[in-house]
């Protein structure tokens, strides 16, 4: 299965040279890390970090996403990136794993790690092989050019969550852990999520603050509780909960929020904004 770009030319440039320039601008922007890191080498099986990244158009969230990709480059790349995003289309299964083929971007093709994907599915009560959830979903696609900017020497396991429950998060985290151990492969989990949607800047800063505090405290239960209590429209809380749970299973018990902004900080329109944050679990 070849997964063609769904949002190239909209969320990011569809021309490879323009895309590279856009990514570099994200790193060098005052909201970004302020530098373009060199990619280091990584050896071994226990990759030291997992990350959280936003998934809006690069003009809005690319500078914030660059903070997490700066950390990944500094640690070197593992063999596999497991990229978990929410389901914006409503298609597919509870936990949809794109288990065979390649993903195409303007920077080249990326192979799916079919062995890791199928092994993950075999250990899960929720996950199944499914392409439908992925074909128009942007939350995973927009991460790939940032990775390809540094290297094409990696594979991916794309996972879309239709079910964002604690049960599904625990199940998926355990399945990833077991698959990694069985295959003896190094991997990093990328949780793709924006924060609150279409609030005023003042309210976004307030409710996103609740979310970010819960993430820093590595408390998936409080995160879900406050999302419900305050009606926080965070689209990818399931991927974030999964990554927090898995990180703790692997002994990565601390997290750090690297950057936070809203779309209003970029556009100047503070009446209706979306929140974006990058974070690292280590």
UniProtKB/Swiss-Prot annotation:
<dbReference type="InterPro" id="IPR002737">
    <property type="entry name" value="MEMO1_fam"/>
</dbReference>
<protein>
    <recommendedName>
        <fullName>MEMO1 family protein Msm_1438</fullName>
    </recommendedName>
</protein>
<dbReference type="Pfam" id="PF01875">
    <property type="entry name" value="Memo"/>
</dbReference>
<comment type="similarity">
    <text>Belongs to the MEMO1 family.</text>
</comment>
